[in-house]
């Protein structure tokens, strides 16, 4: 391993150790805890499993039982933070896999700069060290893409299927991955390739789902999957649907005929279905990664529930998108500023609500939701335009070569 890679990974590890250690200090000395409230849910659910019971006895546990199994060492070692160590390890290994995936696309120095978007990102580090499990999901997705790039379709499908079992949303990648395999094969064994990844993905989904269902029955399906289709969380929610969810949770409906929040899936899934068209002009693996990035960005922006941990879903794909971007440094700085601003406006009002007890849901917090949505829609447009300009340039170069 090159010494530059070792240096980056060492710094990344030390940063995580620092954040992790500070988190333990804050938890023991301050009223406001560093550890994510969800981590205590995971921990308690693992406690039920450790006693031979269902993790769903823990109120608000809405995840696959596999996650609670991962935290069983908390009880074996009698240390509540052991699960966080696992999440940090998945976080770091994901960074290593990002470096491996970037190999061949650019020089080593650029690879490490791009990988730093994940490895040195304070948002990523904070989320994993607070005890959020998104790093496990990101690891599964990146592994699926790593083996897809190397044409190891059976292994890729297994990782991809397991990621869908872990959380539903990666299923949106099925369409662009299918289009990529279909078009990049140039009619050579394309049906067989689609079949291989399709059957292995199905195994990756159904095998763990079957075993979890055998263990916990219908409550597993209800809490792990069905709940997320109807959830109405309105706390810590950046989404433009936040106010609608709040009103509906209080029994106030803006429409007599339908709950408006149920319409949230329409623009979201429409965009996720339309964006893979960007693959038609350029069927390279690099362009597939670009499409997955903008597709995920659109999914998060238009989702009816959007919290900071959801940003991880597209941040893990961002190094591949920025590898060959045509966005200038000046415009890039503006985009980063706007992205931070969109969160800062909302967080300023959320602070007044959470810590000052002020009733700022409307219009203050709603205004923050609108600002967040509009800025992120603008950024999505910038990213899509960037991809289209790259494919147009490649198309023109191809015509010149002919």
From Swiss-Prot:
Transmembrane segments: 5-25, 79-99, 108-128, 162-182, 191-211, 238-258, 260-280, 309-329, 333-353, 365-385
Membrane topology: Multi-pass membrane protein
Keywords tagged on the record: Cell wall biogenesis/degradation, Endoplasmic reticulum, Glycosyltransferase, GPI-anchor biosynthesis, Membrane, Transferase, Transmembrane, Transmembrane helix
EC number: 2.4.1.-
Transmembrane recorded as keyword: yes
PANTHER family tied to this protein: GPI MANNOSYLTRANSFERASE 1 (PTHR12886:SF0), PIG-M MANNOSYLTRANSFERASE (PTHR12886)
Name of the protein described by the UniProt record: GPI mannosyltransferase 1
Classification of source organism: Eukaryota, Fungi, Dikarya, Ascomycota, Saccharomycotina
Gene: GPI14
């Amino acid at each position: 391993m090159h010494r530059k890679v070792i240096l980056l990974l060492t710094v990344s590890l030390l940063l995580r150790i620092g954040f992790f250690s500070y988190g333990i200090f804050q938890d023991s000395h301050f009223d406001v805890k560093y550890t994510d409230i969800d981590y205590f849910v995971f921990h308690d659910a693992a406690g039920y499993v450790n006693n031979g019971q269902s993790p769903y006895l823990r109120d608000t546990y809405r995840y696959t039982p596999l996650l609670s199994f991962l935290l069983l060492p908390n009880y074996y070692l009698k240390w509540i933070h052991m699960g966080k160590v696992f999440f940090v390890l998945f976080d770091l290994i994901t960074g290593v896999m990002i470096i491996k995936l970037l190999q061949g696309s650019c020089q080593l120095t650029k690879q490490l700069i791009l990988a730093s978007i994940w490895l040195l990102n304070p948002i990523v580090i904070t989320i994993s060290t607070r005890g959020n499990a998104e790093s496990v999901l990101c690891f599964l997705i990146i592994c699926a893409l790593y083996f897809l790039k190397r044409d190891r379709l059976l292994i890729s499908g297994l990782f991809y299927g397991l990621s869908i079992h872990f959380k539903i949303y990666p299923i949106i990648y099925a369409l662009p991955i299918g289009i990529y395999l279909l078009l990049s094969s140039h009619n050579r064994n394309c049906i067989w390739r689609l079949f291989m990844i399709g059957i292995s993905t199905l195994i990756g989904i159904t095998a763990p789902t079957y075993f979890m269902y055998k263990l916990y029955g219908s409550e597993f399906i209800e809490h792990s999957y069905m709940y997320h289709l109807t959830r109405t969380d309105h706390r810590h929610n950046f989404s433009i649907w936040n106010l609608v969810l709040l009103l509906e949770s209080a029994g106030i409906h803006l429409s007599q005929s339908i709950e408006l929040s149920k319409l949230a899936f329409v623009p979201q899934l429409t965009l996720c279905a339309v964006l893979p068209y960007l693959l038609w002009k350029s069927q390279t693996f690099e362009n597939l990664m670009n499409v997955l990035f903008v597709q995920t960005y659109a999914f998060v922006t238009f989702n009816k529930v959007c919290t900071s941990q959801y940003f991880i879903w597209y941040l893990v794909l961002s190094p591949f998108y920025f590898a060959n971007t045509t966005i200038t440094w000046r415009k890039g700085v503006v985009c980063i500023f706007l992205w931070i601003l969109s969160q800062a406006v909302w967080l300023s009002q959320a602070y007044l609500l959470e810590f000052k007890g002020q009733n700022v849901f409307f219009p203050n917090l709603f205004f923050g939701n609108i600002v967040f949505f509009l800025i992120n829609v603008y950024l999505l447009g910038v990213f899509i335009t960037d991809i289209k300009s790259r494919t147009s340039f490649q198309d023109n170069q191809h015509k010149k070569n002919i």
